[in-house]
Amino acid sequence: MVKKFTSKIKAAVFAAVVAATAIFGPAISSQAVTSVPYKWDNVVIGGGGGFMPGIVFNETEKDLIYARADIGGAYRWDPSTETWIPLLDHFQMDEYSYYGVESIATDPVDPNRVYIVAGMYTNDWLPNMGAILRSTDRGETWEKTILPFKMGGNMPGRSMGERLAIDPNDNRILYLGTRCGNGLWRSTDYGVTWSKVESFPNPGTYIYDPNFDYTKDIIGVVWVVFDKSSSTPGNPTKTIYVGVADKNESIYRSTDGGVTWKAVPGQPKGLLPHHGVLASNGMLYITYGDTCGPYDGNGKGQVWKFNTRTGEWIDITPIPYSSSDNRFCFAGLAVDRQNPDIIMVTSMNAWWPDEYIFRSTDGGATWKNIWEWGMYPERILHYEIDISAAPWLDWGTEKQLPEINPKLGWMIGDIEIDPFNSDRMMYVTGATIYGCDNLTDWDRGGKVKIEVKATGIEECAVLDLVSPPEGAPLVSAVGDLVGFVHDDLKVGPKKMHVPSYSSGTGIDYAELVPNFMALVAKADLYDVKKISFSYDGGRNWFQPPNEAPNSVGGGSVAVAADAKSVIWTPENASPAVTTDNGNSWKVCTNLGMGAVVASDRVNGKKFYAFYNGKFYISTDGGLTFTDTKAPQLPKSVNKIKAVPGKEGHVWLAAREGGLWRSTDGGYTFEKLSNVDTAHVVGFGKAAPGQDYMAIYITGKIDNVLGFFRSDDAGKTWVRINDDEHGYGAVDTAITGDPRVYGRVYIATNGRGIVYGEPASDEPVPTPPQVDKGLVGDLNGDNRINSTDLTLMKRYILKSIEDLPVEDDLWAADINGDGKINSTDYTYLKKYLLQAIPELPKK
C-alpha cells in the first residue's frame, strides 16, 4: 500500500491561498455565531487504518505507553479498556500540521511529563514551523514552544528514531534531532526553550531523492540515546550517543554531557542507522538500512552491536550482508529490559512472501525468524494472527502460497517489548498496530498469538462521505483503504468496497434511487477500471467495461437524481458522462480539467459545475453544460452541493471565498456576509418545524474556526464544536444525516470520520434499516423456489410489467450488475438446481 499519497495532495491544497472576490452579490444577513453543546466521536473503522511510525513505553511506570501517527496526532494507551486515547484533537484547521508527530518522549523521572515533536512537512506545503508540545498531565493538556524550523512527521525517514530524548538522570534536559541540516538541539528547562548544540559536527547528509519536493530535504539527526550509568540522579548524563542519517559517519558520542562530540571509531559505513537501543549490559544495538523508509526498503541492511565498555563492533546481522536473501533494510529494534541478550529486529518492506521478524536470545549470536521455509511453497509459521478487531485487514483477497493473508504487515519501522512484561510486544505496520501477549512461548516452541492492538486509533485520510435517505447511515470513500459501508457507527465494517482499488476518492448516490451508487478510485493495477457501480447501497460493486476518456483514475463523481447518468471527473482529465453504467462515455461539452461537478437532487436531467471562474448548468443529463452568466462569483470553489428536495438550490463552499447559495439553478448567487470561510458544505434532516434541510459547514464565522449548523437556510448559525474538538484538516467532506436531525459526519485527514450529535440525556436513535427481502424472492413469500423462476421468466419476456415485491431490482438483479436479464434467470435456475451454492448478490 502506497501510504499517505492522499495526505500529501491534501497538504498542497491546504497551503493554497484562495483569493476572496472583491465584489459580492446581494448579502444574506447572518447574526453573530453562538455555540450549542455537541458530543463528538469517531465512526469506528477500527484497526487504526494508517501508519503509526513509533510506539514509546515509559521505562519506569507500567502500562504507560504512547503511539505517534504521521498525520493523525498521538495516542496514550488506556490499560483498563486496552484502547488508545487521542491526545491532540484540540488542534483546529490552522494548526493541522501538528497532527504530524515526528517524535514522542515520556519522562522516566516524572511519568506525568510527556513531550511531542510536532510538524508534518519540511517543505512549503504547510506554513507552520515545528513545535515542541509539553504536558505535565500525560497529555490531557498541552503547552507549546514554536521552533525556528520545520519538522516532518509525514516525511521520509519518519519511523527512524526516537529523535527526542529526555536525560534519565536530569529530566530538565532534552535533546532533539532535527531535519534539513538544522543539527542537534538541547533544552535545559523541560522543553520550554531550545538552543542549537553548536559543537555537534554532523547535521546529516542523506537525501532520499533530490528531484522531488517531498523527498529533497536532509533527513538529519534521527535518534538520541543516553547512557544512564555514566552519571547519577540529579546530574546531567555524561555519555550520549546520537544517530545521524549519513552513510559515511553516522554514530556520534559525547562523554562530557554534550559539550564535545566525536564519531565513534570503527563503526560500519555505507548504511543509515534506523534505531539505536542501549541495553543494561553496555551493548548499543543498531539496525541499519540502505534507505530511510518507510515506503521502500530496497537494498540491504545490517544489525550491529557496539560494546560501549570495550569499543568493539560486532556484526550480528540475521542474514549475512553478502547473501542474496539480504535484500531489505533492518528497521525495527527492540531489547527486552528484563534480559539484555534478548533482541528483536524487523525487515522494512521485504514484501514477499512476507515481512521478517527476527528474535535472538543470545545477544545476536543466533536468530529465529517468525516463519521459516518448509517444502516449497509451504512455510512453517511460528505465529497465529487474529484480525477479528478489524476484519478488513485481509484486504478482501486471497493469496497463493507461499504468501498468505493476512500478512504480518509492511512498513514495520518500529517494534517494542514491554519493559515490565517480556511477553508483551507491539509493532507498527502501514495499516495498524499488531502485538501479542505471549511472546516467550516462541522460545519454548509455541506460537505467538498476534492480534490487532490499535483499537481506538482512527488514522484514515477520508476523502468523501454520503449519508443516503435509506440503507446504511453512512458510506465512505477513504484514502488507502478504499472505503466502507458503515451500518453501525460504533462497530467497524468487515470489508472494504473494492479490494483491487488502492484509494477511494469520490462517492455519490442517486437521490431518488438511493441504492444506486458510484465510486471512483485509484488502483495500482493497469487493467482495473477505476469506477464502480452498486445497486444495493454499496454492499456489492461491479466495474464497467470502459473508463472515462484519458482517465488515470481518482477524482470525483456525481450521480443524477434518477440514476440515469453519472459524471466522472477523473484526476487530471475532463469530466465525462455515461448513461449506460460505463459501457460508453462522452466528454461533457464546455467543461475541462479541474471542473467541480454536482447533481441536482430532484431533477435527474440537471447537473451543475464550476469551471474557470464560471458557473455552468446542464439540463440534458450532463451531456452539455451552459454558462449561466452568474455575476460576481468567487474565483474558485472547493465543493458544490445541491439541496435534496429543492430543485435548483445550489450551495458553493469557496474556502476563503466564503459560502454562496443559489435558488434558481445557478443563474444568480448570494454570498452569506458573515461566513468568513467555508471549506465544505452539506445537508441533513431539517429541524423540527422547518422545511429546509439543516446546513453544515466547516470554516470560520465571526473569526472563529469550527463546525457550524444553520436551521434556517443560512440566516443564522450556531457553532457545534468546541475548542477541544478541532480534528485538524476538515476540508474534504461533510454531510448531515437525512434521517436524524442534528447528526453530522465530517471527513478528516488523519483522524478518520468523526460525527457529532446534540448533547442531551436522550440518545439520538439510529434509523431502522429497511428489510428489502431475499435476493431471488420475487413474490415476497420469503422463499426462493420455482414460482420465483417463473416470475423472472415472465418479467424478462415482458409478459408482466412489474413484480409482486416492492423493489424489483433488488430482488431480481441476481448478479448485481444493475440490470434484470437472462443472466439473472440463469443464475436463479442454477441455484434452484443446486448447481451453485449461493447467489452472486447477497
UniProtKB/Swiss-Prot annotation:
Secretion signal, residue range per the UniProt entry: 1-32
Enzyme Commission numbers on file: 3.2.1.-
Active site: D70, D480
Sequence ranges assigned to domain Dockerin in this UniProt record: 771-841
Alphabetized UniProt keyword annotations: Carbohydrate metabolism, Cellulose degradation, Glycosidase, Hydrolase, Polysaccharide degradation, Repeat, Signal
UniProt keyword Hydrolase present: yes
GO molecular function, a single term: xyloglucan-specific endo-beta-1,4-glucanase activity
Cystine residue pairs: none
Per-repeat ranges for BNR: 134-144, 185-196, 252-262, 358-368, 533-541, 577-586, 616-626, 660-671, 708-718
Temperature dependence: Optimum temperature is 75 degrees Celsius. Retains 25% of its activity after incubation at 90 degrees Celsius for 30 minutes.
Family matches, as Pfam families: Dockerin_1
GO biological process: cellulose catabolic process; xyloglucan catabolic process
pH dependence: Optimum pH is 6.4 with tamarind seed xyloglucan as substrate. Retains 50% of its activity between pH 5.7 and 7.8.
Enzyme class label: hydrolase
Any one cellular-component term (Gene Ontology): cellulosome
Similarity field: Belongs to the glycosyl hydrolase 74 family.
General function of this protein: Hydrolyzes the glucosidic bonds of unbranched Glc residues in tamarind seed xyloglucan, producing XXXG, XLXG, XXLG and XLLG. Has low activity on carboxymethylcellulose, lichenan,hydroxyethylcellulose and glucuronoxylan, and no activity on xylan, polygalaturonic acid, wheat arabinoxylan, rhamnogalacturan, curdlan, laminarin, galactomannan, galactan, arabinan and pachyman or amorphous cellulose.
Protein name: Xyloglucanase Xgh74A
Biological source species: Acetivibrio thermocellus
